[in-house]
Amino acid sequence: MASYDLVVIGTGPGGYVCAVRAAQLGMKVAVIEKNPTLGGTCLNVGCMPSKALLHASEMFEEAAHSFAKMGVSVSAPKLDLPSMMNFKQQGIDGNVKGVEFLMKKNKIDVINGKGKILGAGKVEVTGSDGKAQTVETKNIVIATGSDIARLKGIEIDEKRVVSSTGALSLAKVPEKLLIIGAGVIGLELGSVWKRLGAEVMVVEFLDRILPGMDGEVAKQFQRMLEKQGFAFKLGAKVTAVDTSGKMLKARVEPAAGGPVETLETDVVLVCIGRVPYTEGLGCKEAGIALDNRGRVQIDAHFSTTVKGVYAIGDVVAGPMLAHKAEDEGVACAEIIAGQAGHVNYDVIPGVVYTTPEVSSVGKTEEELKQAGVAYTSGKFPFTANGRSKVNQTTDGFVKILADAKTDRVLGVHIVGREAGEMIHEACVLMEFGGSAEDLARTCHAHPTRSEAIKEAALAVGKRAIHM
C-alpha cells in the first residue's frame, strides 16, 4: 500500500499548485485525477479554451471590421471553424503537458482514478477498469472543483442545449444563440459566437448583468455589448425548452410574473453558475461536513471537520476563480508544513475577458454604501487617455474608490481594453494598504493605458490632469 505525506484529490489550478508547493516543502506527494488529462475544468473545458476562442474570434472580427481604417487592406476573412477549434486544442494540450512536466519535476505521483475518502489518512482510488486501490497518507486535500449548475426541467445534451463545455466545441456557428444567465461565462462565450456570426440573446433573472460587479461598470458595459449587437432580456427567466422541432423553442416569462413569450433559437447555452463537486467523494461517510449549498466546510486554516483533511478552491466558500484556488493551494500546503500560509480575500481580482475587458478588485460602491463606509471616488475615461485615443480604443473608464478619511484604496474597477492586465497594479497597491495618493504619485510610462489608473487616482483628490 502506497503511503504519502499528502494526497491531493483533483488536479485543477488549486490541486496541482497545492501539490507542487507541498513537494517544494519536502513532502512526498500524490495527486488523484479521475479525468484522462490533468488540469481540471480550467485547463480542459474552462478558462484556457475559452481564452483561445476569445482571442481567435477577436482576430477574426478585427480583420473584418478594423483593419481597413488602419490602412490594411485584406479580402473578407473566411471562417475555418475546425481550424479554430484545433488552435484551441493545441493550447489545451500545451498547458496540460506543462502540468504533467511539473508533476515529474517535483516527483509527484499521479494516480488515475476516482478518489473516495475512507476516513482520516485513507483514500480509495477506483480506476476506469473498476479496480480499486487504497492509498495511505498523513494529509488529504480536497480540490475537486465545481460542476455546471443545471436548470430544473431543461436537459443539457451538449449539442443543442449546451453548458459552457458544449459551447466551447460547437460544430458550426449557430444563426441564433440564446444564453441563460448574464454572468461572466455567458458573456464571454456569447462574445465568441457573436463575433463569428451568431445572433445573441441573453436572458437574465436579475435586472442587471454581471451580478456582484460594480453597478455603474455593469450598466456601461451592457451598453457596449448592445452596440456590438447583443440583445438582453433582464428580469426574465427561461422555464422550458422545446427540442422537438428543427428550431428550439424557449419559454420565457418575467421573473416577477406576467405574459409568457416563446423565443426560437438554434442553440441554448445554460450559464447560471457552478456548484461544488463532491459526488462520490465519501464526505458524509467520512464525517466531512458540507454547508447548505453543498460546499465543504472549512476553518481559517482550510481544515474540514475531519482532522488531517483539508479543502480548497471551488469546493469551498468564496468566489469560484482559478487564481483564488491557486492561492489557497499554496497557503494550505504551507499550513500543513507548519508555516503561516495566508490568503487575502479582500484583494482577489475578477476579470471578464470580452472586448472591452472588465476587471475589478476590492469593494464596489454598492458594498461600501451597504456597509456605511464613507468613501471618495475618482474616475477617468479612456477617451482622455492618449494611447487609447491614438489606437481608437476609447471605450470605458477607470474608477477608484478610497476611504474618505484615510485615502486607503478600497476598490478599483476598470472597463476597457486590456483591463485584465491593468488591474494588477491596483492589487499590489491594496495588498500593501496603499492610498490613492501613493498611486497618484507613482510615475507611469507614457503613452500607456495604465496612465488612466494614475489619472483616476488623481481624480480621487479632484486633480486629474487630462480631464
Could you say what each language-model-derived stretch is?
Residues 7-9, 115, 134-145, 179-180, ...:
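Short hydrophobic core segments
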Residues 2-4, 21-173, 201, 206-210, ...:
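Glycine-rich flavin
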Residues 14-18, 161, 186-189, 195, ...:
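Short glycine/serine/threonine-rich phosphate/pyrophosphate-binding segments
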Residues 157-174, 262-336, 421:
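FAD-site-proximal beta/loop scaffold in flavoenzymes
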